[in-house]
Regions:
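Pre-active-site segment of Zn-dependent metallo-hydrolases
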Residues: 1-39, 44-51, 62, 100-111, ...
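Beta-strand-turn-beta hairpins that frame and shape the catalytic cleft
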Residues: 3-9, 83-92, 121-127, 220
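Active-site neighborhood of phospho(di)ester-bond hydrolases with catalytic His/Asp-centered motifs
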Residues: 10-13, 30-38, 58-61, 128-133, ...
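Active-site environment of divalent metal-dependent phosphoester hydrolases
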Residues: 17-18, 39-44, 64-67, 82-85, ...
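Local beta-strand N-terminus motif with an aromatic residue
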Residues: 30, 54-55, 148, 175
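Glycine/small-residue-rich loop that forms an oxyanion/phosphate-binding "nest" at active or ligand-binding sites
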Residues: 47-103
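Binuclear metal-ion centers of metallo-dependent hydrolases, dominated by the metallo-beta-lactamase
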Residues: 68-83, 167, 171-220
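Active-site-proximal loop/helix segments of hydrolase catalytic cores
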Residues: 103-172
Length: 220
């Protein structure tokens, strides 16, 4: 969750069924719910949280349409490269290399558009949430065009970048602070964030690594 004194936004709220979750859907008070792609561990509790807070789900068009068909009362569709100024700040979607589909209870698969990363501009700060993604060269373009205060990068491997690729991503993006994510939730994505921190320090010492435990925060 990204918060200022006046506003809060949550990204990919996978709480129910998440063994690492430190909050419940009813605990969150937010102005918007941003979803990077349609996999169940990212769509998570988005619809419930958005409806409880009478706020929109923000994401690519197909995903927002799917959420509205599933009961979301408000949605704001964007697409890759698109941005919009909301009362809490500006949201811009950027590419991510991954998949995006929701597996229904009957095992049918529903296409939910392209996966995305998110640039979030709030209170004079820029936050980049990569979503689930592999390493790609245009991360340099994202870093060149935006002075990123805080970046969230996956390190778990298997479905996303591993530690070494995430270090390369950090070199391309050059954020002030980077937080590793998408690791340790399941055995197949076990990774050591301390190893990531050591390798970032060696490769780009001007970048600060913050390793957060569930419920912890970092201030900008």
């Amino acid at each position: 969750m990204v918060s200022t004194d006046a506003h809060s936004v949550v990204i990919d709220p996978f709480l129910t069924g998440n063994p690492k979750a430190a909050a419940k859907p009813e605990d969150l008070k937010v102005d918007a719910v941003i979803v990077t792609h349609g996999h169940g561990d990212h769509l998570g509790d988005a619809i419930e949280i958005a409806n409880r807070n009478n706020c929109p789900i923000i994401g690519v068009y197909e995903l927002v349409t799917y959420c509205q068909r599933k009961g979301a009362k408000q949605g704001h569709p964007l697409h890759i490269g698109g941005s919009y100024n909301f009362p809490f700040g500006r949201v811009k979607l950027v590419p991510a290399w991954h998949g995006s589909a929701f597996v229904e209870e009957d095992s049918s698969i529903v296409y939910t558009g392209n996966p995305a990363g998110v640039l979030l501009f709030m209170d004079g700060k820029t936050v980049y949430h990569a979503g689930d993604t592999g390493l790609f060269g245009d991360m340099k373009l994202i870093g060149d065009r935006h002075s990123i205060d805080l970046a969230f990068l996956p390190i778990g491997g298997n479905f996303t970048m591993d530690i070494d690729d995430a270090v390369e991503a950090t070199k391309l993006l050059r954020p002030k602070i980077v937080v590793p994510m998408h690791y340790g939730t399941f055995p197949v994505i076990e990774a050591d964030p301390a190893e990531f921190a050591q390798k970032v320090q060696a490769a780009v010492p001007e970048v600060t690594v913050k390793i957060l435990q569930p419920g912890e925060s970092v201030s900008l």
